[in-house]
Amino acid sequence: MSNGLLIVHVDVSVLPDRVDDFLAATEINASATRLEPGVVRFDVLRDRDDTGHVVLVEVYRDDEAAAAHKTTGHYADWRGAVAPMMARPRRSTRLVNISPDDAEW
């Protein structure tokens, strides 16, 4: 078992009238993020019953890859664009991988 991967769950509450705009801006960021070195996955998920509840699942090879992501232009653009679309500040949880083994991602 390896604990090298960093998995980040970001919980976002989006204003009801801004969901489509938020998802469009987030897809631009997600597409660019998936091309970054050290990024294993970047998923955008929406609650089935609450369309304003969005969860980002970000998987990085290590802390350095996650830190590098925060310095990219597309991340800065996303942050600026979506800040007024959020009903509350986003919440993130940093997790370590237990199973499956990192090599299986």
Model-derived segments and spans:
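An amphipathic, aromatic/His-enriched active-site/gating alpha helix that lines ligand/cofactor pockets
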Residues: 28-40, 59-93
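Short alpha-helical
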Residues: 17, 28, 49-51, 73, ...
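Intrinsically disordered, low-complexity acidic/polar segments
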Residues: 19-21, 53, 65, 101
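Short, well-ordered beta-strand segments in beta-rich or mixed alpha/beta enzyme
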Residues: 6-13, 43-70
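N-terminal first-folded block
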Residues: 3-44
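Glycine-rich beta-strand-turn "strand-cap" elements at beta-sheet edges
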Residues: 1-6, 44-52, 80-105
